[in-house]
C-alpha cells in the first residue's frame, strides 16, 4: 500500500551536489547556503513529480509550499536571466550617497551579526535544545516517519521504581529485579544511589533468575512478590494471559535463606492459579484456583479449600470480566486484614449474565487443538458479558476467619438489593478488625460507605450521598481511600480515612474522623481538581501528598498539605508549565518525580518535605531522545482555549513545520471525548498525530469538549443520559472556527478516533451531515450503547429501561446524514471482547438497507480492541494514513462520479 516515505538516499546525494544561492525559507528566515540547507530546499519539491516522473495521486503528500514549481524557483536565481548591461560611471554626489548608505548598512549588518551570534541562530537546528513552545521551525531537519512513531523511537525512556516497606517500617527501600550486574531480586536503600553514609545495606532475595524443583523441573519467574518479612518470595512461572488484567500461572514459594523453592500446593504443583498473595504476617498464602479460594499456611504442607462451589459461573477471590474491566482494573478481588486474621473476598455469581461469543478464525487462544475433523471450524469463546440493561453479576462480600476456619457475610440494614449493588472498593481499617466498603447502586449515582466490624459480625452505613440530586452526575470508581489510624501523641484522637469529596462543583479530598463521621475536614478546595488522590500519607508528620490541576487543567503538579488542611505547598519548584507523574515511597520520605513534558522528559528521585535529610538522584535525562528530537522537524504546538456556549474548552493545534498563514492547510481533528478523559495535556509526545502534521503537512487539532475531565463537574456531567450529543456538537463548533481561519482549506476537514473516539467520530459526521466535516475515520467504534457493558454505560446513561429515548438518540442511526459526507472509514477487530464487532456489523446493516455506499471497511481477524494480531497494528495506521491522504488529495470526490471506462471514452468522443 502506498505510504509517504523519506526520499531515497541516492536522490538526496544527487541533489546535494546542486549548489544554489540562498533564498528565504518558508518561515521567513534566511536559509543557509550549505549543502544541507540547499538539499532541504530542493527536497521540498521532490513530491511535485518533476524528478521521478508521473506519480499516482494516492502516493502524493499534501505540500505546504506555495512557491510554485521547482523550475520557476531555479529561474529566479539564474544568472543568465535578462540582458547584459554595460557599466557606466558614477558621479561624485551619487558616490557620496553610496558611501553613507554603505556605512549605515555595515553598522546594521554588524549589529545583526552580534544579535545572530548571541541568540545562537548560527547553529543548525540539530544542535539547538528542544523548545516545546516554539512558534516556528527554523532550519531543516529529518521528517518524522510512521516507522519512527510505531517503533517507539520517540518514546521517552523511563525507569520504574517499586517502593517496598521494610520489615520494621523502613522507608526509602526499592525492589529491583533483573538489573544488570546485580543479583536477580534485590532490596536496596535508595540512598545508596546517592552514595550517602546513611544508606543501608543491599539485601538479596534471589541470587539467580531461576531455580530448580527436584531433579528435572527448572523454574523461570514471570513475576515475583516478596513477603513482608523478606524471608519468602512468591514466584509465578509460565504466565498465560486471560483478559486485559488477568492471567494464570504456576506458583512457587521460594525460601530466601536456603535459596530453594517448593510448589505452592505440594500435592498439585502443575495446577494453574489465578491469583495468590502473602498474608501481612508472611505466614500464609491465599489463592484462587478454578474459581475456588484456598489457603496454605507456610508451617504446613497442607492446602485448605475455603470454598467448594466455584466454577464457570461462580467466582471467589477474582473478578469476572466486567468487574476486572470496569471496577478493579486488576486480577484480584481478595483483601487480607492487616493483622492477618481475616480474608475479605468477593463472591461473584454470573449465572444470570448472558453470554457473548467471540470468534477466532486464525488462532486458538485456548491452546487446545480441535478434535479430528473439526480443524476447519473457528474457536469460539463464550464470555459472560452484561450489556446495558441486561442482568449484572450478583456480587457479595464474604469473609474468612483464619483461626476459626469459618466463612461468613455480614448483612447491612437498608443495603442495596443484590441486583442493584456494585461493590467498588474494600479498605481494611488497620488492625481494628473493621473494614470500609464502598458501594453504589447499579446506575452509579447513589453512594454508600459501609463500616463492618468483622469480629462482631455487624455493620452499618456511615455515609450516603446522592449525586444525582446534587448535580445530576455520577460517581466514578475510585481506589484511593486511605485509612488513618488514631495516634494521640501525633494529635489524631480517632481513627479516620481520607476520601474524595465533591466541593463546589470540583473533585477534592477530605479527612473523615472518627470513622463514622460524615463531615470531612477539607484538605483541598478551589476551582481545580485533585487527581487520583491521595498519592501518599506520611503518618509520622501528618502530611498528605497529592497531585492536582491547580496550575492549569492541562498540567499536573505534586503538592503536600497538613492533615488539618493547612500549610499547602508544592513539592517541586517549577516555574513553567509542567506535567508530573509522582510515585512516593511507602513512608512518604522520597518520591520518584517523572517530568513528562512539555520539554524532554526526565526522572529523578528526591526527598520530600517530610524528610529532613535532603536527597536527589537523577535516574533518566533522555539524552538520546533529545538528540533524536533535534535532528527531526516536529510539529508546532499551539495550546489554547475556545468558548463554546459559555464553556471554556482546551484545544491543541499541531501545525506543520514551516507553517505559514499565507497557505491553505487541510485539518484533521483527533479526539477521544470519553467521560472524564483528557487528551489536551502539556506532555511531550510524538505520536501518530505528530506524524500527520510533521510529515504529511496537515494541521491536526484536538478539542477536549464537554464531558471530558479536569475542568469541573458542570462541564463533565452535562452529557449524562445523552452521551455523544455535546461531544459531537463541540467538535463541529470547533471545526467551524477552524474552517473560518485564513490558513485552513475549509473543504478538507476530517475527524478520527478510536473506541469512544470512534463513536464520537461517527456521531459527529452524523450530526454534521457533511456541512463542516467532509471525512471521518472510526476505529473500533461503539454504534449503539445497548451493546456495551452495563457498569460503564449505565454510569453515564442510566439503564435502557429508565432512559429509552436517550439510548435511541445516542445510537448511530441517521444513515441518510452519513451519506451526505464525502466518505468515511470504519475499522474493527473481529475478536474484540470489549467493543464487540456487533457494533460495526449492525451499522453496516443499516447502511445496506438504506443503500448508503460512501464508506470503506477493514476488519482484522482475531484482533481484540487494541488490534495487534498478525501485524494488524501497523496496518491500522498505514490504512489511516493512506485513506486520509486520498481524502485530502480529492480522490474520494472522484470516485463519487466514477463511470466505466468505455462509457467515459464514448462521452469524450461525443463532445
UniProtKB/Swiss-Prot annotation:
Catalyzed reaction equations: Release of an N-terminal dipeptide, Xaa-Yaa-|-Zaa-, from a polypeptide, preferentially when Yaa is Pro, provided Zaa is neither Pro nor hydroxyproline
Domain of life: Eukaryota
Gene3D superfamilies: alpha/beta hydrolase, Dipeptidylpeptidase IV, N-terminal domain
Cytoplasmic topological domain residue ranges: 1-97
Keyword flag Plastid: no
GO cellular component: fungal-type vacuole membrane; plasma membrane
Topology in membrane: Single-pass type II membrane protein
Top EC group: hydrolase
TM region(s), chain numbering: 98-118
EC number(s) recorded for this UniProt protein: 3.4.14.5
Keywords: Aminopeptidase, Glycoprotein, Hydrolase, Membrane, Protease, Serine protease, Signal-anchor, Transmembrane, Transmembrane helix, Vacuole
Presence of keyword Transmembrane helix: yes
GO process terms (BP): proteolysis
Positions of glycan attachment: 268, 564, 809
Pfam families the record matches: DPPIV_N, Peptidase_S9
Stated role: Type IV dipeptidyl-peptidase which removes N-terminal dipeptides sequentially from polypeptides having unsubstituted N-termini provided that the penultimate residue is proline.
Full protein name: Probable dipeptidyl-aminopeptidase B
Naturally occurring in which organism (per UniProt): Phaeosphaeria nodorum (strain SN15 / ATCC MYA-4574 / FGSC 10173)
Amino acid at each position: 500500500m502506498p505510504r509517504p516515505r523519506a526520499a531515497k538516499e541516492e536522490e538526496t546525494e544527487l541533489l546535494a551536489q546542486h549548489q544554489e544561492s540562498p533564498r528565504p525559507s518558508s518561515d521567513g528566515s534566511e536559509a543557509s547556503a550549505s549543502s544541507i540547507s540547499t538539499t532541504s530546499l530542493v527536497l521540498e519539491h521532490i513530491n511535485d513529480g518533476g524528478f521521478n516522473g508521473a506519480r499516482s495521486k494516492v502516493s502524493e503528500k499534501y505540500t505546504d509550499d506555495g512557491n510554485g514549481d521547482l523550475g520557476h524557483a531555479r529561474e529566479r536565481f539564474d544568472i543568465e536571466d535578462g540582458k547584459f548591461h554595460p557599466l557606466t560611471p558614477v558621479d561624485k554626489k551619487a558616490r557620496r550617497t553610496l558611501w553613507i548608505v554603505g556605512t549605515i548598512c555595515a553598522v546594521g549588518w554588524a549589529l545583526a551579526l552580534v544579535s545572530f551570534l548571541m541568540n545562537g541562530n548560527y547553529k543548525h537546528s540539530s544542535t539547538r535544545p528542544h523548545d516545546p513552545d516554539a512558534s516556528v521551525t527554523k532550519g531543516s531537519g529529518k521528517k518524522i516517519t510512521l516507522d519512527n512513531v510505531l517503533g517507539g523511537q520517540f518514546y521517552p525512556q523511563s525507569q520504574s521504581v517499586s517502593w517496598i516497606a521494610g520489615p520494621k517500617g523502613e522507608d526509602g527501600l526499592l525492589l529491583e529485579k533483573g538489573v544488570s550486574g546485580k543479583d536477580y531480586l534485590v532490596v536496596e536503600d535508595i540512598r545508596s544511589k546517592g552514595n550517602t553514609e546513611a544508606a543501608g545495606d543491599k539485601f538479596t532475595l534471589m541470587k539467580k533468575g531461576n531455580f530448580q524443583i527436584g531433579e528435572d523441573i527448572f523454574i523461570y519467574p514471570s513475576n515475583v512478590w516478596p513477603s513482608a518479612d523478606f524471608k519468602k518470595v512468591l514466584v509465578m512461572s509460565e504466565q498465560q494471559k486471560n483478559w486485559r488484567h488477568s492471567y494464570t500461572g504456576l506458583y512457587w514459594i521460594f525460601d530466601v535463606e536456603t535459596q530453594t523453592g517448593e510448589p505452592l500446593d505440594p500435592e498439585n504443583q502443575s495446577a494453574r492459579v489465578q491469583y495468590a498473595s502473602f498474608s501481612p504476617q508472611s505466614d500464609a498464602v491465599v489463592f484462587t484456583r478454578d474459581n475456588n479460594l484456598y489457603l496454605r499456611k507456610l508451617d504446613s504442607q497442607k492446602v485448605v479449600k475455603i470454598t467448594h462451589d466455584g466454577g464457570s459461573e461462580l467466582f471467589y477471590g477474582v473478578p469476572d470480566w466486567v468487574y476486572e474491566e470496569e471496577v478493579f482494573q486488576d486480577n484480584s478481588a481478595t483483601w487480607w486484614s492487616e493483622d492477618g486474621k481475616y480474608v475479605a473476598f468477593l463472591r461473584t455469581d454470573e449465572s444470570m449474565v448472558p453470554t457473548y461469543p467471540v470468534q477466532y478464525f486464525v488462532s486458538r487462544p485456548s491452546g487446545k487443538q480441535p478434535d479430528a475433523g473439526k480443524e476447519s471450524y473457528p474457536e469460539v469463546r463464550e464470555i459472560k458479558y452484561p450489556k446495558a440493561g441486561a442482568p449484572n453479576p450478583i456480587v457479595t462480600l464474604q469473609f474468612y476467619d483464619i483461626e476459626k476456619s469459618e466463612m461468613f457475610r455480614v448483612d447491612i440494614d437498608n443495603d442495596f438489593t443484590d441486583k442493584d449493588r456494585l461493590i467498588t472498593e474494600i479498605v481494611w481499617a488497620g488492625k481494628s478488625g473493621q473494614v470500609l466498603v464502598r458501594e453504589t447502586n447499579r446506575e452509579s449515582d447513589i453512594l454508600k460507605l459501609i463500616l463492618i466490624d468483622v469480629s462482631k459480625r455487624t455493620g452499618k452505613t456511615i455515609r450516603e450521598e446522592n449525586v444525582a440530586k446534587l448535580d445530576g452526575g455520577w460517581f466514578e470508581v475510585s481506589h484511593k481511600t486511605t485509612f488513618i489510624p488514631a495516634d494521640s501523641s501525633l494529635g489524631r484522637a480517632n481513627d479516620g480515612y481520607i476520601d474524595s469529596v465533591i466541593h463546589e462543583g470540583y473533585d477534592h479530598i477530605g479527612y473523615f474522623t472518627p470513622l463514622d463521621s460524615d463531615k470531612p475536614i477539607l484538605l483541598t478546595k478551589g476551582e481545580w481538581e485533585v487527581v487520583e488522590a491521595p498519592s501518599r500519607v506520611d503518618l509520622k508528620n501528618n502530611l498528605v501528598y497529592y497531585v492536582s490541576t491547580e496550575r492549569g487543567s492541562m498540567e499536573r503538579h505534586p503538592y503536600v498539605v497538613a492533615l488539618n488542611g493547612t500549610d499547602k505547598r508544592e513539592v517541586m519548584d517549577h516555574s513553567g508549565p509542567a506535567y508530573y507523574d509522582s510515585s512516593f515511597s511507602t513512608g512518604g520520605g522520597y518520591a520518584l518525580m517523572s517530568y513528562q513534558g512539555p520539554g524532554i522528559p526526565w526522572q529523578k528521585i528526591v526527598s520530600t518535605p517530610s524528610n529532613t535529610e535532603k536527597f536527589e538522584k537523577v535516574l533518566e535525562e533522555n539524552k538520546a531522545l533529545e538528540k533524536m528530537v533535534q535532528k527531526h522537524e516536529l510539529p508546532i504546538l499551539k495550546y489554547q482555549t475556545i468558548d463554546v456556549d459559555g464553556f471554556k474548552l482546551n484545544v491543541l493545534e499541531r501545525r506543520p513545520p514551516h507553517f505559514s498563514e499565507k497557505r491553505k492547510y487541510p485539518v484533521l481533528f483527533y479526539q477521544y471525548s470519553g467521560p472524564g478523559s483528557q487528551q489536551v495535556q502539556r506532555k511531550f509526545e510524538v505520536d501518530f498525530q505528530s506524524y500527520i502534521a510533521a510529515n504529511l503537512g496537515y494541521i491536526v487539532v484536538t478539542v477536549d469538549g464537554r464531558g471530558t475531565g479536569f475542568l469541573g463537574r458542570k462541564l463533565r456531567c452535562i452529557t449524562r443520559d445523552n452521551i455523544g450529543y455535546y461531544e459531537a456538537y463541540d467538535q463541529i463548533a470547533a471545526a467551524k472556527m477552524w474552517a473560518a481561519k485564513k490558513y485552513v482549506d475549509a473543504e478538507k476537514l476530517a475527524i478520527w478516533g478510536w473506541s469512544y473516539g470512534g463513536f464520537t467520530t461517527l456521531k459527529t459526521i452524523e450530526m454534521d451531515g457533511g456541512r463542516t466535516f467532509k471525512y471521518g475515520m472510526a476505529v473500533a467504534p461503539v454504534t449503539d450503547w445497548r451493546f456495551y457493558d452495563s457498569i460503564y454505560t449505565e454510569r453515564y446513561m442510566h439503564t435502557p429501561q429508565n432512559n429509552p429515548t436517550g439510548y435511541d438518540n445516542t445510537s448511530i442511526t441517521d444513515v441518510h446524514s452519513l451519506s451526505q459526507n464525502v466518505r468515511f472509514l470504519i475499522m474493527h477487530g473481529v475478536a474484540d471482547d470489549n467493543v464487540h464487532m456487533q457494533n460495526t456489523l449492525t451499522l453496516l446493516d443499516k447502511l445496506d438497507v438504506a443503500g448508503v455506499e460512501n464508506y470503506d471497511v477493514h476488519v482484522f481477524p482475531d484482533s481484540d480492541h487494541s488490534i495487534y494480531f498478525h501485524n494488524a497494528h501497523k496496518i491500522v495506521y498505514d490504512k489511516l494514513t493512506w485513506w486520509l491522504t486520498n481524502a485530502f488529495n480529492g480522490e474520494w470526490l472522484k470516485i463519487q462520479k466514477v463511470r466505466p471506462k468505455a462509457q467515459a471514452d464514448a462521452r469524450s468522443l461525443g463532445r
